[in-house]
Amino acid sequence: MANYFNTLSLRQQLDQLGRCRFMARDEFADGCQFLKGKKVVIVGCGAQGLNQGLNMRDSGLDVSYALRQAAIDEQRDSYKRASSNGFTVGTYQQLIPEADVVYNLTPDKQHASVVEAVMPLMKKGATLGYSHGFNIVEEGQQIRSDITVIMCAPKSPGSEVREEYKRGFGVPTLIAVHPENDPEGKGWDQAKALASATGGDRAGVLESSFVAEVKSDLMGEQTILCGMQQVAAVLAFEKMVDDGIDPGYAGALIQYGLEAITEALKIGGVTNMMDRLSNPAKVKAFELSEQLTDLLRPLFEKHQDDIISGEFSRTMMEDWANGDANLLKWREETGETAFENAPAYEGEISEQEFFDHGILLVAMIKCGVEVAFDVMVEAGILPESAYYESLHETPLISNTIARKRLYEMNVVISDTAEYGNYLFANAAIPILREKFMPTIDTTVIGKGLTAASNQVENKRLVEINEAIRSHGVESVGKTLRGYMTDMKAIVV
C-alpha cells in the first residue's frame, strides 16, 4: 500500500488539508435518526471503542462488538469490557455480515490487518467507519468500491468522550467522508449521525477530510497535547528538586497544576490563562514563552514537515515491524523519570497557588499552544482544525496526568500519539536542559515571585496583553468557544 496523501497532486493535497467547516447546530436537528434501526458493529473495545459505544447505545443505536476469536476464548480485557457492560459480543464471522456500519476502533497498528479481515465479510453497500484516518491516509488502505468510508473523530481521549456525554455535553468532533468511497452518497448523513450519537454535536462538529484530520491530529498530539506536557513535567520537577523543593510538593504542583492551568485555558483561552497570573508574573511568563518559542520552533516545524511528507509514519511503521522496540524502550524510560516516582504530597495546594508557583508551566503551555497552532496553519491546515488540535484538547490530556501522572496519559492516548510524544520529548528535553533550564529558578517554578520583583511597566504590560489577545489561536478560539456555551468546568 502507498501513502494516499503522497499520491495526490499538490492542488489536491492543499484542497484536502484545507477542508474545515464548522457545522451549524440545525444541521443536526435529526440527531442520529439516520442510523436508528441499523446494526452498528464496533471492532475493538479499548478506550475509544467502549466509550463511544456506551454513548451510542444511550443515544438509541443498536451497538454490538466484534472481537477476534482468541479475545473471546481467552476472555481478554476487550471481551470483559464489552460483556460486563451488557453488549452483545461475537466473532467477526458472527456479526460483521449483518452489520450496516462496521466501526473500526482498534489501535492504528492493527487497522490494516483488521480491515483486511473484515472487508470480505461486509455485505454489499455497508459502511466502514474510523475515528482516525491513519490507515486510509498514511497506509493507503484500499477499500472495496461498494463500501462507504466515513470518519467520526472525537477530539479527546475515550474516557473524556464518555464523561462529557454523561455531563450532558460532548467533545468537539471532526467528521469526514473518504472521497474515493461514497458510492451511494450517504456518507455525510451517516457521519453526522455518528457525531450526534457520541455527543459531538453538543460541543461542535467540523466538516473535515481524512487528510486534514490525520495531519493536524498527529501534529497536535506530538507537540502541545502530549510532548510539551511531558517535557514540562520532567524538566520542572528536576529543577525544583535540584533547588531544594520537597519532591512531594514538586510532583503535586505539576501533576495537578497542569490540570488547573489548562482548565483556565479551556474556559477562556490563552488570555484567561495568563490573566490568572499577577501582572509581574504575566510579564515573566510571556518572556519565558518567547524564549521557549525561539528554541523550540524549529523542532515543531520539523515534526510538522515529517508528518506532511509521511516520514513520521514511515519511521513509526518501521518500529511496528520491529516489535515496537523504540516505543517500549521510551515507555520504560518515562516510567523511570524522577517525576513519575515522586512521593505523594499530603498537603493542600490552592488553585491560585498552581498559577503563582507555576509560572514556568504557564509559559510552556502558552508556547506549545501558540507554536503548534501557527505551524499547522502555515502548513495549510485551517485555523479551526488547528485550534481543536492545539488549545482545546490540551486540558483533556492534562486531566489524565492529574490521575496517574505521565503513565496515565500514555496509557489513555493511542500508541501513535505515544510514539510521537516520545519522539518530541526526547528531542526537546536535551535542548532545554542545555539552553534554557540553567536560567530558571524557583521564582518561576516552585515558590513564586518575591515582593521585590512585584513591579511592572504599564507600557510593557499593554504590549504584552495586546500580543496575547491578538494571536490567531485567540481569534478563532473566541468564536469556537461561543458555540460551546454549555461547557462545564472540570475542576470543581
UniProtKB/Swiss-Prot annotation:
Pfam family, one: KARI_C
Name of encoding gene: ilvC
Family: Belongs to the ketol-acid reductoisomerase family.
Record's catalysed reaction(s): (2R)-2,3-dihydroxy-3-methylbutanoate + NADP(+) = (2S)-2-acetolactate + NADPH + H(+); (2R,3R)-2,3-dihydroxy-3-methylpentanoate + NADP(+) = (S)-2-ethyl-2-hydroxy-3-oxobutanoate + NADPH + H(+)
Pathway assignment: Amino-acid biosynthesis; L-isoleucine biosynthesis; L-isoleucine from 2-oxobutanoate: step 2/4; Amino-acid biosynthesis; L-valine biosynthesis; L-valine from pyruvate: step 2/4
Cellular component aspect of the GO annotation: cytosol
Role summary: Involved in the biosynthesis of branched-chain amino acids (BCAA). Catalyzes an alkyl-migration followed by a ketol-acid reduction of (S)-2-acetolactate (S2AL) to yield (R)-2,3-dihydroxy-isovalerate. In the isomerase reaction, S2AL is rearranged via a Mg-dependent methyl migration to produce 3-hydroxy-3-methyl-2-ketobutyrate (HMKB). In the reductase reaction, this 2-ketoacid undergoes a metal-dependent reduction by NADPH to yield (R)-2,3-dihydroxy-isovalerate.
Residue positions binding substrate: 414
Binding site for NADP(+): 45-48, 68, 76, 78, 108-110, 158
Cofactor: Mg(2+)
Keywords assigned: Amino-acid biosynthesis, Branched-chain amino acid biosynthesis, Magnesium, Metal-binding, NADP, Oxidoreductase, Repeat
Cofactor info, note text: Binds 2 magnesium ions per subunit.
Gene Ontology process terms (BP): isoleucine biosynthetic process; L-valine biosynthetic process
EC code: 1.1.1.86
Annotated Gene3D superfamilies: N-(1-d-carboxylethyl)-l-norvaline Dehydrogenase, domain 2 (1.10.1040.10), NAD(P)-binding Rossmann-like Domain (3.40.50.720)
Stated name of the protein: Ketol-acid reductoisomerase (NADP(+))
Molecular function in Gene Ontology: ketol-acid reductoisomerase activity; magnesium ion binding
